[in-house]
């Protein structure tokens, strides 16, 4: 809100909680200068802020670069204080919600199987189960992949056959689940990364290779749930779907 441009530039407020905690009590350059780095660091430490001394030092340094009080500073300071409190409350609400989702997910008997697949954590796993239910709506892994927009659909006509295209209508949330899980798994050594690198070597760009990996992992997860077995880097002998 323009109270202290140097203080705004001193931190990435979207990436660290400490500077937001700071703004619940100290919003103006004058208030920060009066507090001083030592007192400010102690205040932050009592509120379990990480690297409290560094946050305090950077804040006071920014405050010392501005000696002028800007018009409307008091009103703007109150607004900053209110917004900081709201952001911290929202952060706590998100943490509580995540915890509830994780707890609910782990009550499902399939949770251990799903979570054993690299990249498929409790949040993505919970979203997957919320969408697919008991999987009774899918005849096989191919149908699940098609629902996620990861398998081509036939557009054969009376004149042409073998005409397959990417589906225009698919469930974007389930596609997101498989895409994000594949992206996470691809970053770690293992079969997912090996498959991704293989597809890149074949000439696919990053997104195409990642979607190919996501499609492959649909088959893997389907087989795991069907057989009620945990993921293993070396697949077991195949059996009919």
Residue ranges with predicted function:
Residues 1-241:
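A detector of single, family-specific signature residues
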């Amino acid at each position: 809100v323009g109270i202290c441009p140097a203080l705004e530039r001193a931190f990435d407020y979207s990436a660290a909680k400490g500077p937001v905690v700071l703004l619940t009590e100290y919003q103006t350059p004058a208030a920060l200068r009066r507090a001083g780095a030592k007192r400010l660091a102690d205040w932050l430490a009592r509120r379990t802020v990480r690297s409290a001394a560094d946050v305090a030092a950077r804040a006071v340094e920014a405050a010392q670069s501005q000696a002028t009080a800007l018009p409307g500073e008091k009103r703007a300071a109150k607004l900053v204080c209110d917004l900081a409190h709201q952001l911290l409350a929202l952060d706590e609400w998100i943490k509580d919600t995540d915890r509830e989702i994780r707890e609910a997910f782990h009550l499902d008997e399939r949770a251990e199987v799903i979570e054993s697949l690299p990249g498929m954590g409790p949040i993505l796993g919970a979203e997957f189960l919320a969408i697919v239910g008991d999987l009774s709506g899918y005849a096989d892994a191919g149908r699940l992949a098609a629902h996620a927009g990861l398998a081509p659909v036939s557009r054969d006509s009376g004149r042409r056959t073998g005409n397959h295209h990417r589906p225009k209508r698919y469930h974007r949330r389930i596609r997101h689940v498989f895409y994000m899980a594949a992206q996470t798994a691809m970053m770690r050594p293992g079969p997912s990364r090996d498959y991704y690198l293989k597809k890149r070597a074949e000439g696919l760009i990053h997104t195409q290779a990642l979607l190919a990996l996501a499609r492959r992992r649909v088959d893997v997860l389907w087989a795991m749930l069907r057989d009620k077995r945990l993921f293993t880097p070396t697949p077991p002998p195949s059996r009919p779907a």
